[in-house]
Amino acid sequence: MAGRGSRLRPHTLTIPKPLIPVAGVPIVEQLVRDIAGVVNQPIEEVAFIIGDPAFFGAEIVEQLLKIASDIGAKGTIYRQLKPQGTGHAIMCAEPSLSGPAVVAYADTLIRAQFSLDPKADSIIWVKKVKQPEAYGVVQLNDQGAITQLVEKPKEFVSNLAVIGIYYFKEIGKLKAALQSVLDEKLIHGGEYQINDGIKRLI
């Protein structure tokens, strides 16, 4: 949640987008609650990656730590001081990248039923959309496994758009993949993307 949500101005000039209340509850708080509801074990830690302290100050940090404590988890704060993409943001939380983990974009607002199979090596949650060319989409094989991940395809690949929630049985594998992306300086649009790390795991 290190970005500033410029597409939602003027609301986000004073409130970071993930903290904007929807039906009285901040987006990120509802997201954490939803994830806690589908995880089949206690959540030990919620790591928040936030931006510049000038925009994400002490009051916001306190609010985020309370969101974690409300579900019985330890809250950890990491900083991404410059917008360098989702892949880079995840690596800012490097000390927390081990064991099973859910990665979620803090401004994800999807009201849907979803479940988590802890036996799966990894899961990417998707949603059918009418304009797949505007999203990152996945292609599935006959068994429902992901075979391809394409960002804003120019030609039709599928209508299953990635919603920004991922599960990894061992997030250390994503960490290693993203580290190689950073080492190789694999940049798209001036940023390091999580998708480039995930593609190395498919």
Question: What name fits each language-model region?
Answer:
Residues 106-109:
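The conserved acidic donor/metal-binding loop of glycosyltransferases
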Residues 1-3:
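Short, hydrophobic/glycine-enriched beta-strand segments
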Residues 111-134:
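Conserved donor-nucleotide/metal-binding helix-loop-beta segment in metal-dependent transferases, i.e.
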Residues 21, 139, 167-169:
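Short, well-ordered beta-strand micro-motif
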Residues 145-202:
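Catalytic-core segments of class I nucleotidyltransferases/pyrophosphorylases
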Residues 139-145:
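Short acidic-glycine loop/turn motifs at beta-strand connectors
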Residues 7, 13, 20-21, 25-103, ...:
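Conserved N-terminal catalytic core of the sugar/cofactor nucleotidyltransferase
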Residues 5-10, 133:
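Short N-terminal binding/cap micro-motifs at the start of the first secondary-structure element
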